[in-house]
Amino acid sequence: MRVDDFDYELPPELIAQEPLDRRDATRLMTVDRLKGEVGEVSFREITRLFRPGDLLVVNDTRVIPARFFGVKESGGRVEVFLERRLAAVGERWQCLLRSSKPSRPGTRIVLAEGVSAEVIGRSDGDTWCVSFTPVTGFDEWLERNGAMPLPPYIRRSAADADRERYQTVFSRQRGAVAAPTAGLHFTPELLDELRERGVEIATLTLHVGLGTFMPIRVERVEEHRMHRERYIIPSATADAVNARKGGKGRVIALGTTTCRTLEHAARDDGRVAAGAGETGIFIYPGYHFKTVDALITNFHLPKSTLLMLVSAFAGKELLFRAYHEAVTRRFRFFSYGDAMFVH
């Protein structure tokens, strides 16, 4: 299977650069896999697509303000992009470093408010292991001095408003460097309305990493290796998912991160195990879904692993017809754009 088979033409002006004033003012494309039909409603109407007994599983990860700048002791500005915390004790992180001259082990970086960093050595791929001091209060320092890590296709600097709008209303667990964007459309009122309709809402955590922005660098889909991301599935969530396997209702995944986590933890009978770990699951056409019955997701980049996942779930022909419709109807694409309900 060729990566180029997942390409499509997207006018640049359809890439959303700002969120709408209201989270639920976005548009929702509906994709019926059984009937092969594509429709459209307002996102605030999504509750009528649920049935009593359904389970909505959401990713409660919270995006950290992971981007900031410093100056090397030897001179020269450096941009630091935190990817993940490496040590349970101390502030040792896997980071991207950007500067005019390459970094090397032993490089020291002077940061705001008396904080400093030292490059320890290479980590995975293009990343570095970096140690920060002092370690006390580093999360608070980051909140004051870091910027939200907006995706590269948003052609502007992060603003104060992004600290709220690039988070879901149910974000709790700090650790992501990209938002689970399908969740950005939900308001507390919509979640309450779902509960009133007899829908159960459960949480899991998958800390979205830098790999979500990384292009595929091979020609064949099967040769690609996914980045690994940390996840937690609470016992209550596993129990709620497993109850649906007895016919109580559908398991509806809010976003590809939730979908990947559930499928990673699923057995052949669709039941999932509670626990914590890392997943590098890569889902593309030909994959047999074990536990997810419906998927809410945003529109994804051409030739991306996320587009391949949704192609596997919806069927590639139907999905690309839906994307063609979305372009024709001038839907807004990517993180701050519109959404899709595939069922």
From Swiss-Prot:
Its main location: cytoplasm. It is found in: Cytoplasm. It is an enzyme of class 2 (transferase). One of its GO terms (cellular component) is cytoplasm. Pathway: tRNA modification; tRNA-queuosine biosynthesis. Gene3D superfamilies: QueA-like (3.40.1780.10). Its EC number is 2.4.99.17. Belongs to the QueA family. This is S-adenosylmethionine:tRNA ribosyltransferase-isomerase. It comes from Geobacter metallireducens (strain ATCC 53774 / DSM 7210 / GS-15).
